[in-house]
């Protein structure tokens, strides 16, 4: 049997970072993962460049049944702290839209940074390792990992959510929480494209690949202003992914296809200058022609010239283009979702240490916890912050 101070389950962003920090603080750490590579989701993120944090991280950008839970960890290890770490390793990065920070080169650099940090902490990393059983004993926990028995004082669960099962996602962390009597909140896919009902989808097939800036609004009033992308399955793009976290099955979403236009004024002006111009050609100055043609087949806009367009028709047109109501059929699910909403109930955990109130020595960090960030680096920051908070608690316990 092998003995460790800390075993961390899951070599994703949160697990790697926590293991490294705990190791550097003097803990003897074992990090295990069932995959053949560490940081698989990191490598896939941000189009291979890893959107590693966001300049504008704040608690309001996170969803949780307890919105206050994330505040402590985010305040104690901030985006600036991780940026400092990137700079220390000489990893070049740049800011894209809305405060999103990406590596100039490759997400591999972030994984290499984390592995180097683990090396500095003398962390033992075992990949292709399945945790077959976990038992509580007087001194901590007894784990069966493949054919190896491991004893540990502290157990950190950083096994992630259900999103992207192709990268090894599983319900392991939720089942472990339930094994020890912790409440797990219902989960669903988030930061995920919408699918559409067949009649509307058939009309929109010609738009696959078309992207437009828009403001999308959920029934609860939450809105996002970014681009939307029409796909062969439905709707995607940053604005849609963001809104999916706030959408409930059966609800409508409102899409403003012309968020920057005073459409009434534009049409009135064009009517004076080009009275015989078709409405379709006029709107093609503002929107992709394929989208205008599609909206016409959906009877969202009349087939008339500008001088034929009467006031009621114009009012209806403005409403259709700036408050287009669409009812998604559902989402693409965990297969393409970037994150999972729900998970281990934060009421079960200390917001300062991530330790379970009922089970001393058991910690949950990262996506397995009911804390879900917006698109744009927020979920990576939660991984760094929750991992750091947990590591500080592990280090303090080691000193005792």
Regions found by a protein language model. Give the residues of each.
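N-terminal Rossmann-like FAD-binding beta1-loop-alpha1 element of flavoenzymes
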Residues: 4-31, 390-395
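Short hydrophobic core segments
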Residues: 7-9, 131, 150-166, 177-178, ...
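A glycine-rich dinucleotide-binding beta-alpha-beta segment and adjacent secondary-structure elements
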Residues: 127, 293-372
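Glycine-rich active-site loop/strand segments that organize a redox cofactor
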Residues: 49-95
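Glycine-rich loop(s) and the adjacent beta-strand/alpha-helix scaffold that form part
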Residues: 154-200
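An anion/pyrophosphate-binding glycine-rich loop and adjacent beta-alpha core
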Residues: 36-38, 43-44, 52-59, 92, ...
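Feature captures the FAD/FMN-dependent oxidoreductase FAD-binding
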Residues: 76-154, 292
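Glycine-rich FAD pyrophosphate-binding loop
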Residues: 23-47
């Amino acid at each position: 049997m092998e003995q460790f101070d800390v075993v961390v389950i899951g070599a994703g962003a949160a697990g790697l970072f926590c293991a490294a920090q705990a190791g550097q603080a003097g803990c003897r750490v074992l990090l295990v993962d069932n995959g053949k590579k560490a940081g698989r989701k990191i490598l896939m993120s941000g189009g291979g460049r890893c959107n590693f944090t966001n300049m504008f991280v704040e608690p309001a950008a996170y969803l949780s049944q307890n919105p206050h839970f994330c505040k402590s960890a985010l305040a104690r290890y901030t985006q600036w702290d991780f940026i400092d770490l990137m700079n220390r390793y000489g990893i070049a990065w740049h800011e894209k839209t809305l405060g999103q920070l990406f590596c100039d080169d490759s997400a591999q650099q972030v994984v290499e940074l984390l592995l180097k940090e683990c090396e500095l902490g003398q962390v033992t990393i075992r990949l292709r390792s399945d945790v077959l059983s976990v038992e509580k004993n007087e001194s901590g926990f007894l784990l069966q990992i493949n054919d190896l028995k491991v004893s540990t004082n502290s157990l950190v669960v950083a096994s992630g959510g259900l999103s992207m099962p192709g990268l090894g996602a599983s319900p392991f962390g939720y089942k472990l929480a339930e094994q020890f009597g912790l409440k797990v909140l219902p989960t669903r896919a988030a930061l995920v494209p919408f699918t559409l009902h067949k009649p509307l989808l058939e009309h929109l097939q010609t738009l696959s690949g078309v992207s437009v800036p828009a403001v999308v609004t959920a029934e609860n009033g939450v809105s996002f202003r970014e681009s939307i992308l029409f796909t062969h399955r439905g709707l995607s793009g940053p604005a849609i992914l963001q809104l999916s976290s706030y959408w409930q099955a059966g609800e409508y979403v409102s899409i403003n296809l012309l968020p920057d236009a005073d459409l009434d004024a534009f049409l009135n002006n064009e009517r004076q200058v080009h009275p015989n111009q078709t409405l379709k050609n006029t709107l093609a100055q503002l929107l992709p022609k394929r989208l205008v043609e599609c909206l016409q087949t959906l009877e969202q806009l009349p087939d008339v010239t500008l001088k034929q367009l009467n006031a009621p028709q114009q009012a209806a047109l403005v409403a259709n283009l700036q408050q287009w109501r669409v009812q998604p059929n559902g989402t693409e699910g965990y297969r393409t979702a970037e994150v999972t909403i729900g998970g281990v109930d934060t009421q079960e955990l200390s917001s300062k240490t991530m330790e379970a109130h009922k089970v001393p020595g058991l910690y949950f960090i990262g996506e397995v916890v009911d804390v879900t960030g917006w698109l744009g680096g927020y979920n990576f920051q939660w991984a760094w912050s929750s991992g750091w908070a947990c590591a500080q608690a592990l280090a303090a316990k080691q000193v005792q």
